[in-house]
Amino acid sequence: MHFFYPPIRMDLVEISYPDNVSKNVLERTKTISKNMGRSVVVLKKETPGFIVNRMLAALVDEAYELYDEGIAEFEDIDIAIKKGLNHPLGPFELSDYSGLDIHYYAKLKKFEESGDLRDKPKTFLKEKVLKGDLGVKTGKGFYKYNKE
């Protein structure tokens, strides 16, 4: 079962259903999730990132590429995604909430496994992580946050 953060706002649960899990376990897991008021999606095969994070990674990668190429400022990319795709957060805001260190190390791991330069973390992301600007949890990432 994969819940989303923050769970009080995000009602989706992704359930991975590999071949070695019984149909009974799947049905019980779906029932438990629905009893918690969750929407349920089932993956027939395991995949890194499940459905949502795999799709989201492509969006964030493109946003980072647009910013890195100097095509648009990160604030404008966030506005475009929020207004144009009706997302509640833009990719840079979401990165700040997830933690820039999480994004950096996930990309680094993927790059180490694939060797594909497209998977290499962007320099601007590495610089933010090295400076300790990790997003909401440190009060600064792409945006500044009031630490309470």
Describe these PLM feature segments.
Residues 52-53, 61, 95:
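Residue-level micro-sites within transmembrane alpha helices that shape
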